[in-house]
Amino acid sequence: MFEKILVATDGSEHGLRAARVALELGKISGGRVTAIYVADTNRTSHLPDDMLLFSIRELLLKEGKEALKQVESLAKDMGVAFESAVAEGNPGSEIISYAESAGMDIIILGAVGRTGLDKFLLGSVAEKVVRNSKIPVLTVPREQT
């Protein structure tokens, strides 16, 4: 049933926790896990300085590659088929768009991301994906300490 699993990661501990859940599901189902990182370039589009915009974009993409390497390493350790993708734009929209175009069976993501506002938000990205995706979504809660 879950042969094509998409997990969104933002490099946070919450994103890594979601990746672990996705990889466990992939291992159990024999499926392939695709990790996606979306560089939120919408937040930077209003910046007046093109060089600053370019620098921030490059930093976001570098951060994304590092986040995806972490998930890839876990996938190798667990023996799960893995691939990765990077997108730019609004994270919620890009996750849904990628999942639909790639024919994913499920989307997995952390209920909260990097934001410190998690008491106000399910996680704006998670909420957008849950509300708008036609594909089943599994949100992974923050680990309780």
What residue spans do the PLM features occupy?
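Short beta->alpha linker loops
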Residues: 51, 86-90, 112
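Intrinsically disordered or low-complexity boundary/linker segments at protein termini
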Residues: 1-17, 132-145
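Small/aliphatic-rich secondary-structure junction motif
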Residues: 3-53, 83-85
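A short acidic, glycine-rich active-site loop
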Residues: 53-66
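Glycine-rich, Arg-bearing micro-motifs that act as flexible, cationic patches
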Residues: 106-128
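Short, hinge-like loop/turn segments at secondary-structure boundaries
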Residues: 50-54, 101-103, 125-126
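Structural beta-alpha unit
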Residues: 73-107, 145
